[in-house]
């Protein structure tokens, strides 16, 4: 279906014809733990990866399969793997690349959970990192070590929506024989497709814009299909014969889909962060309206940014659509249709004023999620990024008076009125 437009793909990929068993047009929920084999030879072929069909619900499910095919198509990848959460998608990706003493070069201004994973959790397993100013390519290149396994970035940084130059970073990564991993949770494939700019692996917290309604946890790993896993010798688990599958090389067995096949067959098999068919179904419902929702998110965001930029109680708005933002040129290059509905601003005053503003909002919900159809708010320094030191917070541009907004799809007049009411409460 690659000839179809995005809006058509988000509705049809993975179920181009009605369900063969029932003729249902909607994707069925296949609530089963396991699958019947035709005979012993059939079972052996499945377990030996000679026949790429269903074995057990921890590895594959037909509802999950539709979700994977759909997101892979929307991102322009060759294959995808859906897992239980965005954190699981990121963790599996980094474990697959970094095992046996690997090192990552990572964007400094990323989601606090990803920062904590790289800086504190993975080092306990022998995997290290260097955080860099992603806009300084000389600093990025200088951070690459002999054991570096990948460069890790986000299309829109969390929480300030800063934008890396994906094209340039991809060239740099490939110059050193490294894959570029891009978290496209905030960008979404509707606004930007990192694989088209040189990314090799794309990860998502599907909980956010893909699902879109704050109901369902899920994560997605998309394989771009073009990276040579055998060339450098740094990825033997993917390229070399695997003893737990009778010497199968995932590069030879799965071809362009080697990366996600390895994670499914080894890491998911052995650690089990499996997405449920019910969660996969709910995420598919969200994806069907992704383009429609993103257009409204972007439209509302433009108006909120303009409102805040000229508000007398606002010290600064951190949004790349503003002409004086340091990433404005990159925003125009990579996001011609808008975006960045998760961003921060700094209220005049300090933490007390920020908290009072947040506590007086009515439509905006104070919670840890983002990218919901509903508008959301949080104080990053005391919540999502509270594990960071004072210096780390400063490096990420998070101050005591920083407030993160996630602009929803409510009527813009109601959103602006709610913000103004909270400002008046702070006076």
Label the model's feature ranges.
Residues 2-61, 69-70, 403:
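N-terminal "arm"/small-domain region of PLP-dependent enzymes with the aminotransferase-like
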Residues 39-91, 113-120:
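Conserved N-terminal alpha-helix of the aminotransferase class I/II PLP-enzyme fold
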Residues 78, 101, 119, 128, ...:
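PLP-dependent enzyme catalytic core of the Aspartate aminotransferase-like
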Residues 151, 219-221, 317, 343, ...:
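Well-ordered beta-strand positions enriched in small/hydrophobic/aromatic, beta-favoring residues
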Residues 156, 185-187, 322, 348, ...:
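Active-site beta-loop-alpha junctions enriched in small/polar residues
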Residues 222, 344-346, 406-408:
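Short hydrophobic/aromatic beta-strand micro-patches
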Residues 271-274, 278-280, 285, 289, ...:
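Conserved small-domain helix->loop->beta segment predominantly found in fold-type I
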Residues 2, 18, 80-310:
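Conserved PLP-enzyme active-site core in the AAT-like
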């Amino acid at each position: 279906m690659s000839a179809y437009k995005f809006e058509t793909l988000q509705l049809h990929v993975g179920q181009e014809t009605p369900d063969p068993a029932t003729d249902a047009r909607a994707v069925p929920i296949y609530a089963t733990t396991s699958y019947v084999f035709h005979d012993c030879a059939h079972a052996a072929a499945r377990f030996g990866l000679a026949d790429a069909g269903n074995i057990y619900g921890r590895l594959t499910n037909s509802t999950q399969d539709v979700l994977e095919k759909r997101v892979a198509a929307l991102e322009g990848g060759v294959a995808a793997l859906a897992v239980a959460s965005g954190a699981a998608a990121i963790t599996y990706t980094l474990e697959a690349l970094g095992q046996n003493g690997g090192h990552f070069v990572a964007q400094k201004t990323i989601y606090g959970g990803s920062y904590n994973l790289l800086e504190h959790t993975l080092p306990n397993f022998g995997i290290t990192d260097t955080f860099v100013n992603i806009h300084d390519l000389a600093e990025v290149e200088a951070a690459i070590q002999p054991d570096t396994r990948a460069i890790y970035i986000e299309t829109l940084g969390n929480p300030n929506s800063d934008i890396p130059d994906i094209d340039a970073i991809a060239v740099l990564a490939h110059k050193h024989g490294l894959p570029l991993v891009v978290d496209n949770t905030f960008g979404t494939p509707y606004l930007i497709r990192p694989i088209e700019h040189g990314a090799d692996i794309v990860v998502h917290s599907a909980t956010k814009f893909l699902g879109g309604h704050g109901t369902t946890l899920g994560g997605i790993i998309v394989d771009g299909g073009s990276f040579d896993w055998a060339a450098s010798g740094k990825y033997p688990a993917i390229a070399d014969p695997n003893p737990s599958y009778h010497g199968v090389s995932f590069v030879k067995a799965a071809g362009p889909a080697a990366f996600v096949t390895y994670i499914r067959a080894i890491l998911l098999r052995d650690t089990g962060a499996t997405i449920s068919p019910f969660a996969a179904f709910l995420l598919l419902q969200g994806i069907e309206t992704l383009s429609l929702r993103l257009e409204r998110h972007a439209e509302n965001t433009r108006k909120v940014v303009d409102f805040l930029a000229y508000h007398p109680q606002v010290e600064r708005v951190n949004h790349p659509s503003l002409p004086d933002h340091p990433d404005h040129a990159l925003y125009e290059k990579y996001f011609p249709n808008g975006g960045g509905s998760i961003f921060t601003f700094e209220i005049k005053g300090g933490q007390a004023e920020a908290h009072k503003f947040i506590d007086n909002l009515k439509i905006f919900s104070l919670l840890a999620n983002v990218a919901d159809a509903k508008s959301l708010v949080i104080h990053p320094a005391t919540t999502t990024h509270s594990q960071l030191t004072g210096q780390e917070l400063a490096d990420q541009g998070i101050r005591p008076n920083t407030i993160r907004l996630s602009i929803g799809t409510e009527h813009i007049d109601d959103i602006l009125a709610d913000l103004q009411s909270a400002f008046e409460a702070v006076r």
